[in-house]
Amino acid sequence: MSRRRHSDENDGGPHHKRRKTSEPLEIEDRLESLICRVGEKSTSSLESNLEGLAGVLEADLPNYKSKILRILCSVARTLPEKMTVYTTLVGLLNARNYNFGGEFVEAMIRHLKETIKLNAYNEAVYLVRFLCDLVNCHVIAAPSMVAMFESFVGVTQEEDIPQVRSDWYVYAVLSSLPWVGKELYEKKDVEMDRILSQIEAYLKQRQKLHVSILQVWSAEKPHPQEEYLDCLWAQIQKLKKDRWQERHILRPYLAFDSVLCEALQHNLPPFTPPPHTEDSVYPVPRVVFRMFDYTDAPEGPVMPGSHSVERFVIEENLHCILRSHWRERKTCAAQLLSYPEKNKIPLNYHIVEVIFGELFQLPNPPHLDVMYTTLLIELCKLQPGSLPQVLAQASEMLYTRLDTMNTICIDRFINWFSHHLSNFQFRWNWEDWSDCLSQDLDKPKPQFVREVLEKCMRLSYHQRILDIVPAAFSALYPASPSCVFKYGDESNSALPGYSVAVALTNAIKNKASDKEIFNILKDIPNPNQDDDDDEGISFNPLKIEVFVQTLLSLASKSFSHSFSALAKFHDIFKALSESDEGKLHILRVVYDIWKNHPQMIAVLVDKMIRTQIVDCAAVANWIFSPELSRDFPRFYIWEILHSTIRKMNKHVQKIQKELEDMKLRLAKQHKHRDSDDNDEDSGRKDGPLEEQIERLQEKVESAQSEQKNLFLVIFQRFIMILTEHLVRCETGGIDVNTAWYKNCRERLQQIFLQHHQIIQQYMVTLENLLFTAELDHHILTVFQQFCALQS
């Protein structure tokens, strides 16, 4: 009996201790949950929730102050759509505990400086805005906020800095004024007028060469595509004219005015913006996306005008929701649809415009394209009675404006629309788009419909497309995705290499070895054997043609069959692709046999790069070759090129990462050696690591050289074909601005935009070798616009 009691005590002891040690963690988790979820669905009002939470936090401050500070600083960055809820909470805590309010303000300033140094400028904007709203909650004194704004605007006077640095500090000030402008003007109107005058002077002298490369549409009608600072400035000017009155910001602190106005306020410490360094990377400028106005939503609430600050506030809050919840499409969709004050605005129109604005954002969308697709599908499920109609209206608008739409954005529109249709049984009223049938096939509308059908086929099958799209569209139907094996028909028996192709077919079917295959191929005569060029003698195009055509036709049943064939006969491919011409000819043959199946071409080229049968430069040269001129404007061609560039970039990054890791290992080894003076072996251990670092350094330099060469090849080819077009038009008295020219020039822009961070490294080389002052201004302007993105 006593033994059992003793056992019970032993069991209870450790369990009791574990519970005690876990209690603080449980309380911290509970505090985090309470803070993060305040203002969400609740039976009681937001005000009573805030008051209750302030009481709970005040009681926990003695034991959990640092944790509460961390959580509040974190939500200021990560949940900006609930900013005014959290500023009110901080205001209530400051009214109850002045010291805590001071510590919170100090912590926020520290976070702001760290965030700027880390180049996290989007989050830094939220922190600035949060500090501004604390002025409304009587936590921060208005004069010290004005002083911070003065230091921000002072950046515009700095010398030898990129314009994008000044842009960000001006944006941080202007974008905060909808929340705090009224309060600051009441307290410091003279100083605020001076700040706005400085901003106006800065905006007038800014260069805006970058605008056209970032616009979704080249036409200014029906909606101007304004530069973001110009648009925001117009909105703030109108807000000032309206005496800083706005009607869309949730301001829960107004309910606590009698409590908050009694609180003591804190002065912000003098703020010096962190200086510009070589490592500073500022946000790229933007163009404001406009798709709808009040005429597009005739029923229900009126959509605010483009220069109304309410339009900015609504869009900014919706962007914040997307940033906070993009990883969870269901949560994100629900949050968007439960937007506060949603009954006062045409919410569905705002949501669709904001989502398309992000999807079409140049240089790149904030998130993966597929995120926006799945989010719109989720929104349609949650609002089946209204949102699909708005989305159909938007699709129709986008289609009607294809002639002036940027080619990069047309690509994204194709991807989204085809993916969206695949989730709704490919239902669409194709007759509404029959106007494209009377246009030349190289025009944007027929090209768009053709590419959409091609993409839809990838997501279903060929016959399905023929069944759902009217026969009137047959000229735009995708080709039947079958291979074209020229040695498969006896009527072609007179073709050179035909008999070898038959023998090769039988040998592969009978599982012949590589040696046996080589023996069959050696009998193929070389059409280049009379050439004087040594490389011409070793390069046999007919041998490549017979082998690649035969093998790929036998493996044509599926992607996996083709992949297996490449793997099984990899050594033969490597032997045939020893020369640059050999690599290029393999790609030509892949195109010849699979010209009716663009997706197969794309996956085979991808696999050949991965298995080093061909290299990235060969793919670039092939894409610009005369054999592909017919398909040059096609979507899949650029899909292949960008995939090739990404592979090269990832290869370089992988080796750079290996080098950095190795250097860290060596540094740790040195640190360990310094702390252990008696270790005589440590010096000997450095040797192998240093040798590995040296080898990796050489690999990095070699990979970067390949990367630079790839971009040089691509840009050189662009310059050549664009120059040929311009000369041809000039000598023939033809208008330069053809559909082909628009497409090609915008594809050049796409290379710059999609890979801008990598290309920045090679700017000097590009400027010295290719984009020189002598180049035609039609081409040179694209390079200058790109340079302006970070200047």
From Swiss-Prot:
Any coiled-coil regions, as ranges: 641-714
Assigned keywords, A-Z: Coiled coil, Cytoplasm, mRNA capping, mRNA processing, mRNA splicing, mRNA transport, Nonsense-mediated mRNA decay, Nucleus, RNA-mediated gene silencing, Translation regulation, Transport
One example of a Gene Ontology biological process annotation: positive regulation of mRNA 3'-end processing
Disordered as annotated region, ranges: 1-24, 668-687
Domain of life: Eukaryota
Main localization, broad class: nucleus
GO cellular component labels: cytoplasm; nuclear cap binding complex; nucleus
Pfam families for this protein: MIF4G, MIF4G_like, MIF4G_like_2
SUPFAM superfamilies the record matches: ARM repeat
Family affiliation: Belongs to the NCBP1 family.
Function: Component of the cap-binding complex (CBC), which binds cotranscriptionally to the 5'-cap of pre-mRNAs and is involved in various processes such as pre-mRNA splicing, translation regulation, nonsense-mediated mRNA decay, RNA-mediated gene silencing (RNAi) by microRNAs (miRNAs) and mRNA export. The CBC complex is involved in mRNA export from the nucleus, leading to the recruitment of the mRNA export machinery to the 5'-end of mRNA and to mRNA export in a 5' to 3' direction through the nuclear pore.
Subunit structure, as described in the record: Component of the nuclear cap-binding complex (CBC), a heterodimer composed of ncbp1/cbp80 and ncbp2/cbp20 that interacts with m7GpppG-capped RNA. Component of an alternative nuclear cap-binding complex (CBC) composed of ncbp1/cbp80 and ncbp3.
Protein name: Nuclear cap-binding protein subunit 1
Organism of this sequence: Xenopus tropicalis
